[in-house]
Amino acid sequence: MSKQYRFETLQLHAGQTVDPTGARAVPIYQTTSFVFKDAEEAAGRFALTNPGGIYSRLGNPTTDVLDARVAQLEGGAGGIAVASGSAAITYSILNVANAGDNIVAASTLYGGTYNLFTATLPRFGIETKFVNPDNLEEFEAAIDENTKAVYIESIGNPGINLIDVQAVADIAHKHNIILIVDNTFASPYLFRPLEHGADVVVHSATKYLGGHGTTLAGVVVESGKFDYKGSGKYPGFSEGDEHYNGLVYGDLPIPFTVKIRAQLLRDTGACITPLASWQILQGVETLSLRVERHVENARKVVDFLTKHPKVAWVSYPELEDSKYKALADKYFPKGVGAVFTFGVKGGKEAGIKLVDSLEIFSNLANVADAKSLVIHPASTTHAQLNEEQQKSAGVTPDMIRLSIGLENIDDIIEDLAQALDKA
């Protein structure tokens, strides 16, 4: 799109050129592979000198629209959709780190990411150094000559902590390494990390982007601004790829996502299906509308809980007594999302009783659904962490995580009220 359209227009139109059939909706190209008009074109496709379809593991016209749309919504130069958020996170690390390298990460991460960093990546020879994200000096101190990336979440899961993204980006860039930000809990409608120094953004598109709890997907978006070749830190971008006639990824306009596609997606195959891409696109078209209502409902629920006599604490960065209030004001003028945590007086047992007493809320391991959701993180999403690791991640035994949906707000609050009465 030649004109610089606004967010609400981009979420409906970005990335799509009407195909020869004239279909207004994005078509589902349900095919595994694509016909070459001749041998020369086939050779060019495989050499990456002729853009176009080869095999849907590497790309598909339906997915191409999703790639471009999310990239534009994030203000990025390029994007690539994959099979899940976990795949997006994994690829973002493996794209820059090899055996003997390390990354520096905030300790307050989603349990699945924490497990990836502590259980799986070490098998590849990649170490993770966890730091307290409230102390910027720890990021600086943890970086060494083998550090390839700093990794944070724009809104921590499940503690809903905020980080000074620009300050962390400045630290990373001082050492000529990239900052990767998981922006799942914010969505590009509430926050765009690339505008505050991040180099790569990852999403579990299953959450707000898709929005309806139907489809697994992940997306990686790059700024296109980081000089991988000139940084001296990334030989995979500065040295030629012998499998593609010496192609140097660092010479490309969007090196990060091209390298994922040409190497990691080619070899490990965590590809998104055309149908899944189409389903996520349906959610993206209403992203701003849904997130506005999510935030509106969440604020009212937070107000209700903070005044309830059975509630011990509420963690939501917009609250005046939150230590993240200043960061919420700085980075999240439209709101800090609709996922937050709280504790019930009576501790873990009372909290679990509340979870079991809710009727509208579904007890399940997802967030950012149109429907309201609840979970007890210590016994589920972060159960594989020991007590010390849970504490470092901001998970307490009494913590309950809510994801506020789009139901009538009175029904949501009444459901919480009756469950609190039973807790």
Label the model's feature ranges.
Residues 2, 11-17, 80-307:
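Conserved PLP-enzyme active-site core in the AAT-like
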Residues 2-60, 68-69:
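N-terminal "arm"/small-domain region of PLP-dependent enzymes with the aminotransferase-like
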Residues 38-87, 112-120:
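Conserved N-terminal alpha-helix of the aminotransferase class I/II PLP-enzyme fold
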Residues 51, 77, 216, 276, ...:
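Short amphipathic alpha-helical segments
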Residues 118, 145, 290, 356-357, ...:
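PLP-dependent enzyme catalytic core of the Aspartate aminotransferase-like
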Residues 221, 341-343, 403-405:
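Short hydrophobic/aromatic beta-strand micro-patches
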Residues 268-271, 277, 282, 286, ...:
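Conserved small-domain helix->loop->beta segment predominantly found in fold-type I
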